Amino acid sequence: MKRFLAISVMAVFLMAFAACNEEEHDGAGPRRGNYFVTVLTGPTSGIFFPIGGAFSSHLRHIGYRTSVTATGATVENIRFILSGQGEMAIAMSDAVIQAIQAYGAFEGQSPATELRAMMGLWPNYVQIVTVEGSGIKSFEDMRGRRIGVGAPNSGVELNARMMFEAHGMTYADANVDFLSYGQAIEQMRNGLIDAAFVTSGLGNATIRELSANNNVAFVPVEGEGLRRLLELYPFFIESHIPAYIYGTAADTPTVSVMNIMLVSDTLPSNVVYDILESVYSEEGMETISASHSNALNHIMLSTALRGISGTVIPFHDGAVEFYRSRGMMN
């Protein structure tokens, strides 16, 4: 009897062990309820938050335990992922590259080689917003003016710093305020700021609010400053802000950089594969596309590799397996 009991206990143990191994094996569907996925986004006034919230909602719907967290956006999200405070995070690809190569905002830190990408999202446009009558019609016109450059070490502020550098200027050439773009535009509404950097998708809600009672204008990124910027930081993409987006007089030349979804390297490959398979399903796309026009226009399987392929940013193994199964990777 004791021998039979011992054999029975051992059999149960082996079955449980085999089940665990099966769950971690590539291609096996994960037990979704066993995983808690925190999605790191950005300020509630920006675009990261509603789109990240849609990802969290969809994950909850299909059985994952999940939450969405408002943050300071890109740089904070990268640090939270690295410290284990989140499993998925929206971030601008330029800042991810800086973290991996330990320069810019990550100067002096160890290269963040454990960062992993899951998918490309939508382009972030550098929108240097002002109002008509401010006297700011070129980047150089911001000399000596009050400029909101983003919260310290945020993705917006990193872009502002690179823009100043490309135009042969530093923050010392202007009166800069380290404010989030929501705060900066509120200050502009009150006449306390002359221009503000807003790096986000087009149709930003805070700029739309400003345009309700002001004739907004954008500082162009063009000429020698643009040439130098693309030479220094080739991850930027030459772009423009269409006039119809905010009702400006004409299209404005600028640059953009892709947002991507980072994923913790501690998540098993089959979980990442499962998330991607579900996100790119008809139901997943319907939920995410409804969150914002930028999600509707840009987040789709055909753009999944954009902003990641050809850079130093590695994909998570589960993402590699998924894209290979779709014939998108060798």
Predicted region positions:
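Bacterial signal peptide processing site
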Residues: 21-23
